Amino acid sequence: MKCKHCQLDETKIIYKGSYWTLILSKQDYLGRAILSLNRHIGNFSDINDNELMEFKIILHRYESILNKLYGCTMLNWCCNMNNAYGKDNCSPHVHLHIRPRYKEKVIVNNMEYTDKEFGAHYDRFAPIQFDEETIQIIFQMIKEQFNEI
């Protein structure tokens, strides 16, 4: 069985560490990303000390970058493992969904982004907010900043 978190799209990788890989996800929320453990395990509680340390470093970097670039107010982090159990051949893989949240509107490449659900739970079905050109600009801006720190 193929695991989508073991076979990541190389063109969307923001950062690949020794233990975790950060990829840009669909841009329904500006800067939305997925942080995926590089090894295949099914429980977050099974990560080791080195993985936990790198996780903390990546968390700090990503929060700092989104704050610097776009004035991000906060990040929602969630580890939803339940979808793996909806398949016959269950094979969960530890990964976290990162949804940045913005109190103020943000302009990127002359496109305005407003977090319409700020202060409430996110919309799982929110539409993508940016065109492909702007998504590439977002990706490059974040990746460049990530590699400078």
Name the predicted role of every residue range.
Residues 1-149:
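HIT superfamily nucleotide-processing domains
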